[in-house]
């Protein structure tokens, strides 16, 4: 029988949520006021990733940030991260009971209705909806959702979970994404590939959270 008790809660609105692939980016962005962030490193063994995970968690604690570790849930549990983010394929192998018992928050990626229903049944801390627009930062097996589909999913959830929109969201697309009622916007290249990442981050913080960096 599936344990339907909820995972540890997080803020209803997570605000700006950068997803980055290095400890260097974690430190830069926490240093300019970002409060929710995800370390997404790929194609490394747990042994190879552990040092980065430890350093990222330490930075999250230092800056009192909501730091999520993508995929490496065993390391996140071992080193007491704030939270873990899992894709649908990760849900097949992760020990969700161990993550919950450790008190970690859980975020889950979804791409269409069936995956959204699966996420709701798990009762995670937040649900990510995407990808909204075409993106080059990750190979995606599904088509972009678009704003109409995002709006429908937000309405279907009826505020039961914090929500995060992700995928191809540039600065100029932020107002339209926020208008759907989503509680957070995850970005990758809008910051990491910006000509001036500091300015891009400050602009995004003001647009999404209404505060200065």
From Swiss-Prot:
Q: Give the gene that encodes this protein.
A: thiE
This chain belongs to the protein called Thiamine-phosphate synthase
Q: What is the lineage of its organism?
A: Bacteria, Pseudomonadati, Pseudomonadota, Gammaproteobacteria, Enterobacterales
Question: Which Enzyme Commission number(s) are listed?
Answer: 2.5.1.3
Q: Which HAMAP family match?
A: TMP_synthase (MF_00097)
Q: What does the note under cofactor report?
A: Binds 1 Mg(2+) ion per subunit.
Query: Quick one: which residues bind 4-amino-2-methyl-5-(diphosphooxymethyl)pyrimidine?
Result: 38-42, 70, 109, 138
Q: Among the record's GO biological process terms, what is one?
A: thiamine diphosphate biosynthetic process
Q: Binding residues for Mg(2+), per the UniProt record?
A: 71, 90
Q: Which organism is it from?
A: Pectobacterium atrosepticum (strain SCRI 1043 / ATCC BAA-672)
Q: Which NCBIfam families match?
A: PRK03512.1 (NF002904), thiE (TIGR00693)
